[in-house]
Amino acid sequence: MVEMLPTVAVLVLAVSVVAKDNTTCDGPCGLRFRQNSQAGTRIVSGQSAQLGAWPWMVSLQIFTSHNSRRYHACGGSLLNSHWVLTAAHCFDNKKKVYDWRLVFGAQEIEYGRNKPVKEPQQERYVQKIVIHEKYNVVTEGNDIALLKITPPVTCGNFIGPCCLPHFKAGPPQIPHTCYVTGWGYIKEKAPRPSPVLMEARVDLIDLDLCNSTQWYNGRVTSTNVCAGYPEGKIDTCQGDSGGPLMCRDNVDSPFVVVGITSWGVGCARAKRPGVYTATWDYLDWIASKIGPNALHLIQPATPHPPTTRHPMVSFHPPSLRPPWYFQHLPSRPLYLRPLRPLLHRPSSTQTSSSLMPLLSPPTPAQPASFTIATQHMRHRTTLSFARRLQRLIEALKMRTYPMKHPSQYSGPRNYHYRFSTFEPLSNKPSEPFLHS
């Protein structure tokens, strides 16, 4: 026994060193440990993900103190050993840290479980809930939040950090096939969330198409991403809120979380894709909360250069019409979304004198390098100005025509958050969560 003590001491020290290294979760981000050879089809009535397929996936569970049970409500993405990224609307009704538990490394979860989790799962408490300062509970604007984990989670074979976009990467290309994951409902009116983690392939959808008359009719803002299919059938649903929308450039690239599951009309309906909070618009905010160094560790080392052929948000010149020109629709829909004016590009076939460009004298020829640099600066300046103008118009419209709270409307409402409400276990199916 005396001879074994040094060996035991060495083993204990080695384990402690490995645990210390893993606790930081500073390893490569966005890497999958396992993946399904069938490449999952959908979350709604679809394919289950394998254990370790999405190691940054987190289950946010509501904790009931009287019976110590935990009920899955939202998803989230692990940033590092201290922070989880999720949606702000998950905390509309449960704002206290002691109302929540976090489960990492899970493929299966038990709804209403009152026993400790088993390996490789890890359960943690929430130390702090950080909701975006400009989050709007009615319009769902700035639907993003961070959770401080306590004690820090340990990364390993089934738990690892996600990647976030690089500052220089810009919006992903369209068309682009991405993935969504979650434990949400597998159909629109399911009795409770899925017990197994589901994965789905979805296509990014151009924001102008998503905002067209037959789709969301301008209710998607410039800080959102639309993903799904025109015919529906594959989509996120209640209980998937806060979970990631993930894309990668090629099979050798890490997955990057480009969106946070936010809202939608129903689940898997035609021309009603899922709407996600665009993460690249909130990188500065995330860095201000978790620290710039922590953000840098989860950004890909070689960002993909932004594209101008298929931009995520199509650029349109600012309209010459004043902000008050854009009025609300005559009949307000029963589901509430922020209204964004659709700024249309004048057609190239139009020959009206009011649209003809003014003639200007020719300018002297410039070197090629100077011309390219000037065009790049003008494009960035114009795009920035257009986005600021668009957001100003949205803000003015909200002040001039304040949106009513959903409770002030009568009749059926088919707008749903992707948040799963919890109810005590019973044989009676629960209805999808309706904000009121």
UniProtKB/Swiss-Prot annotation:
Residues 43-291 form the Peptidase S1 domain. GO terms for biological process: acrosome matrix dispersal; acrosome reaction; activation of adenylate cyclase activity; binding of sperm to zona pellucida; penetration of zona pellucida; response to steroid hormone; single fertilization. Pfam families: Trypsin. Inhibited by SERPINA5. Acrosin is the major protease of mammalian spermatozoa. It is a serine protease of trypsin-like cleavage specificity, it is synthesized in a zymogen form, proacrosin and stored in the acrosome. Belongs to the peptidase S1 family. Heavy chain (catalytic) and a light chain linked by two disulfide bonds. Forms a heterodimer with SERPINA5. This is Acrosin.
